[in-house]
Amino acid sequence: MNGLLLILLVYITVWRPRPCQCIQERDIQRDVEDLPSVSYQVQYGIRSQRDLMANVPIDQVPMIGVNIFDAFLKNGRNNDSRALLSFMELMQHGVQSFTVDLEPRNSQWMLKKSNISFTRFLNVFQTYVNGSDNNLSANMLVLLLKISPGNESNSTGTGKNGSNLTRILDQSFGRQRIYTPDDLDYDREYGRTFSTFGANSVGWPILGSFLYDKKRRVILMEVTNHLVYQNTPYIFNGSSILHLDEGNATLGIPTTVDQIQNLSSISWKFLEASFTTTDIKQYVDIGYNPVITNEYSVGDFGDIYQLLNLTILWSWKPDQPKTIQSSDSAREHQLIAYNCAALHYTSANFSASWDVENCYAIHKGLCKHRFNDYIWVISKGHDNYFGFDSHSESKCPEDYYFSLPKTPLEQLAITQYLRNTSSEDALFWIDMNSVSVNDCWVTGGPDATCPYQRSVSKRNFVAMLTPVTVCSFVILCVVFYLNVLHVPIHNNRKSWRRIITEVSKWEVDGVPS
């Protein structure tokens, strides 16, 4: 019996399936069915985009936005609860910025033309932030506040010039997740801010530091200049830090490297407009953050998905990154591993997007200049993905290195280079792969590890398992021996009892005299 129990114990500790070492995403309750469920492909794509932009200043991080009033509340076609549920669903689908119209009414701040208080809105906002506050799902969120001054009777109790907005934010959301003007001043004073050209005393922190070091999630900007900012220390004066176009874009389409660089020096480029599926992607490609003002009712809210599907992933194709499993028979005849990314250039419309490609396919690679993110060339020769490993002979020209575009403007620089060199449709290797762990897309070559899951090679796994297996076998042999061959003391139990009885007769009770 002891042997059977030990065998069971060894099986449980050694052979049982190992759980994933990554942090599991919290399930966020889905109460609406207007938009399709967020697929794993979209989740992997959003996560890979965020991770590759870890060193990008936050003012250059691309994001899609929605105007809450125009999309849900205008003309009163949606009830308040439905609008809040749609707001939650948009955040779950990757929308990162929202325009919020506020007006003072009944001694409190209310969302324009609705019965939704700003406090109630922030409670829904906080629910999403708390539910996504882990290294798999954390992202930056921006609220663009439009303040209606209101009349004196309506504004009584809301605080002069918005002074009680700070109290509302403290009570409903909390200071710890908000990046404030004081935080920015501190970072600039101590040299922790950057622009696209490097360290900059008037720049912004990089995304990785913002999310993981400072543990911030939210930036609030007021774009109507109705607040006294000494009374609202959590809110940025939007007119001094962002470029907001409404209706029509005022920034031209850059056609040279210098023009792209100049465009990248403009912080927080937003365009509020009614978009179509044909134009919204074009604005993303030239560095704008579209804020959708299209009007939707309960019956047609799902139409917004067409716009999101084209823009949430500025890098990958809408149906990528796919998980492609090759059959055993195919592996026997050729080397196959669909764990590498390639930039697919289409010459017909001078566009580019990323595809999952077989790592052993032969392509050229994209090389970035060491001192300028907007100067790119094609590698000298063709090779499989592993041929572009940093340990291999460099296939990039001097002062260039194998890389990938980290923003839409960098990708625009690539497409213009390919256009000027009359490149045909082609695939080019970029520094993105999931070689370590399937569906965990990382940069840094094939040796890069997945930060969310521990990868164990077969050789290392055998090395780890062998000592445990040998020890378990020895223990089993000992247990088997003890069960089969009895110890002599058990065979002579009666003799031992007689000896003990005789010895006990010589023991003296009490204290000797």
From Swiss-Prot:
Glycans are attached at residues 79, 115, 130, 135, 151, 154, 161, 164, 237, 248, 262, 309, 349, 420. InterPro entries: Telomere_Capping_Maintenance (IPR051008). It holds the Pfam family TIM-barrel_MTC6. Its main location: membrane. Residues 1-22 form the signal peptide. The keyword Glycoprotein applies. Keywords: Glycoprotein, Membrane, Signal, Transmembrane, Transmembrane helix. It is a single-pass type I membrane protein. It comes from the Eukaryota. Residues 23-460 are extracellular. Residues 482-513 are cytoplasmic. It is found in: Membrane. The chain crosses the membrane at residues 461-481. GO terms for cellular component: membrane. The keyword Transmembrane helix applies. Belongs to the MTC6 family. May be involved in telomere capping. This is Maintenance of telomere capping protein 6. The gene is MTC6.
